[in-house]
Design a protein with these regions (language model features):
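The feature marks non-catalytic terminal segments
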Residues: 78-230
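Active-site beta-strand->loop->alpha-helix modules in alpha/beta enzyme cores, enriched
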Residues: 1-85, 207, 217-230
């Protein structure tokens, strides 16, 4: 968690939401550049393969969501450049995010299925776990978002796919270094797992070892032939 205060601004216009949120944070000494620097540091520190963030329009116009997504689009580039925010580069090195998804982004759309029971969650779905998590977010329970998440007693929401407005399942691939999605439904499509990377690294080591053996075998055989020819 960051130390940024939970401040609020809202507008249906992205530009206005951005300006209002920027002004609110600047009033407490926090600039847009601070947002970019913080996200850049997080990327370098945690080295994610995939990053997922807010809608560029802040979903319903939430100014801080707008600030966050805008800053991220700059941070994914900054994180690769050691001269950009050099202090965090010196601490953690640089890092290139392989894929960046934004909520409700219109290009390269992807629909996630968060209603599949997951073994790691003891058969619960990702959406059910998110509902349990939001139950602890007491400061937000008075907002319209509570109904968006849970529905009503007469019509409770049991699945993420049942939410149509600001669907939690719809994203778009904003940036990729590993190609575009072909299958869909998986943020990690085209991304090699840690296990696969370890296997590839081991194969590379074996290949190098084999080449070295072959080289010395050929040299030895060549020396033997020279002796015979003499």
């Amino acid at each position: 968690m960051s130390e940024f205060p939970d401040l609020y601004a809202e507008s249906k216009e992205r530009k206005t939401a951005f300006e209002q949120a920027s002004a609110v944070f600047e009033s407490v000494g926090i600039t847009y550049d601070d947002f970019i620097g913080y996200i850049t540091e997080c990327i370098r520190r945690f080295k994610p393969y995939v990053v997922v963030s807010h809608d560029l329009d802040g979903e319903y116009g939430h100014g801080t969501h707008v600030l966050c997504s805008a800053a991220l689009t700059e941070a994914i580039t900054c994180a690769t450049d050691a001269e950009c925010y050099p202090e965090s580069a010196n601490l953690y090195g640089t890092w290139e995010v392989q894929k960046t998804y934004l909520h409700l982004y219109g290009k390269n759309p992807i629909v996630m299925d968060f209603d599949v029971p997951l073994e790691h969650f003891e058969g619960k779905t990702a959406f059910e776990v998110s509902q349990e998590g939001f139950a602890c977010h007491k400061s937000q329970h008075w907002t319209w978002f509570y109904k968006w998440m849970y529905g009503t007693e007469e019509s409770p929401i049991k699945k993420a796919s049942a939410i149509r407005k600001y669907s939690p399942c719809q994203y778009g691939l904003y940036d990729t270094k590993v190609g575009f999605d072909r299958i869909g439904g998986d943020f990690f499509e085209n991304v090699k797992s840690y296990t696969q990377q370890e296997r590839d690294a081991e194969r590379e080591k074996e290949f190098v070892r084999d080449q070295v053996k072959l080289y010395f075998t050929m040299r030895r055989n060549y020396s033997d032939w020279k002796l015979i020819l003499r």
